[in-house]
Amino acid sequence: MKPILPDYNSAGVLIIGDVMLDRYWYGPTGRISPEAPVPVVKVENNEERPGGAANVAMNIASLGGHAHIVGLTGEDEPAKVLTETLSALNVKCDFVALPDYPTITKLRVMSRGQQLIRLDFEDKFENTDATPVLSRMDAALPNVKAVIMSDYAKGSLEHVQAYIQKARAANIPVFIDPKGADFERYRGATLLTPNMKEFEDVVGKVKSDQELVEKALALVKEFDFEALLVTRSEHGMTLIRRGQEPFHLPTQAKEVYDVTGAGDTVISVLAASVAAGKSFEEACALANAAAGVVVGKLGTSTLSEIELAEAVHGSQDTDFGVISEKALIEAVKKARARGEKVVMTNGCFDILHAGHVSYLNHAAELGDRLIVAVNTDESVKRLKGPGRPVNPTDRRMAVLAGLGAVDWVVPFSEDTPQRLISEVLPSMLVKGGDYKPEEIAGGKEVIAAGGEVRVLNFEDGCSTSEIINAIKGGKG
């Protein structure tokens, strides 16, 4: 069966926690200072990246999800840099600025791929008022499907219990990247993602997988969690849930250059995947694949939806089902570079029947890759009228993505896919029915780009409307 990535565009996630700015200074070093026995670095360039909870938000945005971040900052230049950088990535920033504190900033001096020193600019947030964060949560919770709390023990989650209770009262799952040995403060959270060291700091040394599972289950019961996901470095990760068998995943990392931010990526992909409708097991598999990618990058890193898809299915296998428009365009570019012919079609596909399957099989035979663009629910309602669609967008796309003939499934919200087709520009555009090529939405653009437009016949005797009427009439 062909695995399916979720539609991350449907994932709204609220992130609360320790936001920070990671700064990097890069340069060569070839001598020792005459002033002290330390290397001299000639700084040639620099870089600034959101870190901590801000890196979590950036990861979700990079996947195509909707990230809303709340955290404590100072009233200073690093706070402005964070806001500008994240806003440019479509992250909604809702920071609480405290004039008596600096924004947490970490400066790393790098040379020849190695970190020589890290300078931290910070004061722990203490005795802060929870009200500003709680009021921001009230505004955000109706628009999200998951909450992440990213704890680096810098004080932004001083009132974490109040935040957990508010989210859980709204029936929103809470995912926490913990810090320290006091798991009592996280009581009632949905899922924690401790690494092996953090886990052993709480339960003591673990000598076997069975002991890990037993101790994890004890924590789940003691602190009223739903699950623990223990990340285990070269041993992969293990999901432990109440009443479920443990779920072990081996590591997917090929090379490890830098683990900075890997935990951020794990919890980002995990929560975004659950918010997009995936089970815990499916979400963990995606998070494990994501971790294998980011540890192969230098510095605090994110990954795109296309990188995640390639990590899950192999760099040469792009048969990954449901995909965002942005990731689709990137995937099509790679397919063209491999000399593959890309075919595209579109439709509502409300109740998939034999006629649809026959049509899609025929379309797939015309090239190497088949894209199916699917009208969203709002688009179908405008085109088909009341009572349609019968099946919502995510279910229609999931069924299509499960067909062997289909490579990519992408939603569009307009009445026609003309704009989407003009962005993708497939080698061939296919449409079923009694059309002239020049009448097909997007056909002119495809032809102008050197592509081809084909009209295929539908199989007689197959109609979604007839199926609906038969069901209403109690037939069949």
UniProtKB/Swiss-Prot annotation:
The gene is hldE. One of its GO terms (biological process) is lipopolysaccharide core region biosynthetic process. This is Bifunctional protein HldE. PANTHER family: BIFUNCTIONAL PROTEIN HLDE. Keywords: ATP-binding, Carbohydrate metabolism, Kinase, Lipopolysaccharide biosynthesis, Multifunctional enzyme, Nucleotide-binding, Nucleotidyltransferase, Transferase. Residues 1-318 are annotated as: Ribokinase. Residues 344-476 are annotated as: Cytidylyltransferase. SUPFAM superfamilies: Nucleotidylyl transferase (SSF52374), Ribokinase-like (SSF53613). It comes from the Bacteria. It comes from Vibrio parahaemolyticus serotype O3:K6 (strain RIMD 2210633). It catalyses: D-glycero-beta-D-manno-heptose 7-phosphate + ATP = D-glycero-beta-D-manno-heptose 1,7-bisphosphate + ADP + H(+); D-glycero-beta-D-manno-heptose 1-phosphate + ATP + H(+) = ADP-D-glycero-beta-D-manno-heptose + diphosphate. CDD domains: RfaE_like (cd01172). GO terms for molecular function: ATP binding; heptose 7-phosphate kinase activity; heptose-1-phosphate adenylyltransferase activity; phosphotransferase activity, alcohol group as acceptor. In the N-terminal section; belongs to the carbohydrate kinase PfkB family.
